[in-house]
Curated annotation (Swiss-Prot):
One Gene Ontology term from the biological process aspect of the record: translational termination
Keyword Cytoplasm: yes
Family that this chain belongs to: Belongs to the RRF family.
Gene Ontology molecular function: any one: ribosomal large subunit binding
Keywords of this entry: Cytoplasm, Protein biosynthesis
CDD domains with a match to the protein in the record: RRF
Gene: frr
Cross-referenced SUPFAM superfamilies: Ribosome recycling factor, RRF (SSF55194)
Record protein name field: Ribosome-recycling factor
Gene3D superfamilies per the UniProt record, alphabetical: 3.30.1360.40, Ribosome-recycling factor
GO cellular component: cytoplasm
Superkingdom of origin: Bacteria
HAMAP family on file: RRF
Alphabetical list of InterPro entries matching this protein: Ribosome_recyc_fac, Ribosome_recyc_fac_dom, RRF_sf
């Protein structure tokens, strides 16, 4: 096992953390954030198109999102897509711009969102552990083939475990920060 293989493992772990960050950004914390609409796809001329390719999304105020379609004829389709996305948002249009008022979160909704954050963080931890398992399997094969000594195997496994612990801690910190942001009244 070379340093490049360890680097590759850490890159995969970093990708899992980045995916978690992206998922957490889509969890609404009571303030307007354009990324909460990243999961919205609009049926535009028969094709499922991401909202951010059809319109610019902005947050001019703490509890307001504005969506300015590049093609005004798509306003109705965009409104339908936002309602269908089941984000708990109600879009309103004046013909040129769609406005979405972000309602304040109830305590019950906050608790539900914390559970969603927990689910996302657990999925990321499982990805990290799977990467660790794959790397350890690769190390054991190398030892079996005679490419590694038993001492080298243990040393590399310790390195893998240290990296795993570091990335699990990063995930826990991201989740904790998001939970605090959600529970902030």
């Amino acid at each position: 096992m070379s340093a490049s293989e360890l680097k590759e493992m850490e890159q995969k772990m970093e990708q899992a953390v980045q995916a978690l960050s992206k998922n957490l950004a889509s969890v609404r914390a009571g303030r307007a954030n354009p990324s909460i609409l990243d999961s919205v796809f609009v049926d535009y001329y028969g094709a499922s198109t991401p909202l951010n390719q059809l319109a610019s999304v902005g947050a001019p105020e703490a509890r307001l999102l504005t969506i300015t379609p590049y093609d005004k004829s798509a306003i109705g389709d965009i409104e339908k897509a936002i309602q269908k996305a089941d984000l708990g948002l109600s879009p309103s249009s004046d013909g040129n711009i769609i406005r979405i008022n972000i309602p304040a979160l109830t305590q019950e909704r906050r608790k539900d969102l914390v559970k969603v954050v927990g689910k996302y963080s657990e999925e990321a931890k499982v990805q990290i552990r799977n990467i660790r398992r794959d790397t350890n399997d690769q190390l054991k094969k190398m030892e079996k083939n005679g490419d590694l000594t038993e001492d080298d195997l243990r040393g590399f496994q310790d390195d893998v475990q240290t990296s795993t612990n570091d990335y699990i801690n990063k995930i826990d910190q991201l989740a904790k920060n998001k939970e605090n942001e959600i529970m902030e009244v």
